């Protein structure tokens, strides 16, 4: 069962890594040709995402280590540690760095976006690839969401850190590319690079917001959270027996994914 979960979670990670490598290469080519602030931010975003997926694969390998005297419950929580590192990288290297780069161009909008239609083509290519990766993540969420929870509740209660990260990254990638497309079009038709720089700032803020959400979730999992609401109800229902007059209190902790 655990092996099946690991394979499922890692499938979305590998799909996202492949997508981000392709998209990162195309975005850097687009930035080199156009000088677009939004394209630079998107390029940084994709490189950070590639590093994040590699960290998740490392964490998954460490989490699969066998039980030992030193770690009698295994090392599965290593996933949460690496996931927290990923959230920090997404905030600082992806979001904060991108905001700083774009803000510089926002207040000094002397740059011009060149080869606009080539940039648009690269952004559309990236949008298609990232959408495919996002569909893989959504498919895995549906497979794991056996209780039929809403998407928001599933994300809040899920103990599958790799799924949370990939869904957040792919969602930000799709939204970020749409923002970059909008900024590039506005800059082209108004001949004003302000909109390109503004879209870069918005993309950076989007990444910072996603990183903070992920960091909050993984911090809780790393220090220890109770089981999900539905699992707790199942545990309590097991005590609904005639020989038990009253259930006073139940304390639980989720040890690992």
Which positions does each model-derived feature cover?
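Alpha-helical transmembrane segments and adjacent TM-loop junctions that form the membrane-embedded core
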Residues: 9, 78-257
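Residues at the start of alpha-helices and the adjacent loop-to-helix junctions
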Residues: 8, 22, 33-35, 51, ...
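Alpha-helical transmembrane segments of integral membrane proteins, especially early/N-terminal helices
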Residues: 5-15, 44-57, 81-94
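Histidine-centered active-site/metal-ligand motif
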Residues: 45, 71, 248-251
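Aspartate-rich (DDxxD/NDxxD/DxxxD) Mg2+/diphosphate-binding motifs
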Residues: 59-78, 108
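Acidic (Asp/Glu-rich) catalytic motifs at the cytosolic membrane interface
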Residues: 19, 32-65, 103, 164-178
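Topogenic membrane-insertion module of multi-pass membrane proteins
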Residues: 1-26, 31
């Amino acid at each position: 069962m655990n092996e099946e979960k690991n394979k499922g979670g890692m499938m979305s990670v590998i799909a996202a890594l492949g997508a981000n490598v392709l998209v990162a290469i195309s975005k850097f080519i687009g930035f080199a040709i156009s000088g677009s602030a939004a394209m630079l931010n998107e390029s940084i975003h994709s490189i950070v995402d590639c590093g994040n997926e590699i960290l998740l694969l490392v964490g998954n390998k460490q989490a699969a280590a066998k039980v030992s005297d030193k770690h009698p419950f295994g090392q599965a929580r290593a996933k949460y540690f690496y996931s927290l590192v990923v959230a920090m990288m997404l905030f600082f290297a992806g979001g904060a760095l991108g905001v700083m780069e774009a803000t510089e161009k926002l207040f000094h909008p002397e740059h011009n976006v060149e080869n606009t239609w080539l940039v648009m083509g690269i952004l559309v290519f990236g949008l298609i690839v990232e959408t495919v990766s996002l569909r893989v993540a959504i498919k895995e969420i549906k497979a794991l969401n056996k209780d039929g929870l809403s998407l928001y509740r599933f994300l809040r209660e899920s103990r599958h850190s790799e799924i949370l990260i990939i869904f957040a990254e792919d969602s930000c990638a799709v939204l970020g590319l749409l923002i970059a497309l909008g900024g590039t079009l506005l800059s082209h038709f108004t001949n004003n690079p302000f909109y390109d720089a503004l879209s870069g700032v918005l993309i950076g803020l989007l990444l910072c917001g996603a990183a903070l959400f992920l960091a909050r979730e993984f911090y809780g999992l790393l220090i220890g959270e109770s089981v999900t609401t539905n699992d707790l109800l199942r545990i309590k229902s097991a005590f609904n027996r005639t020989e038990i007059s009253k259930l006073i209190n139940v304390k639980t902790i989720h040890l690992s994914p």
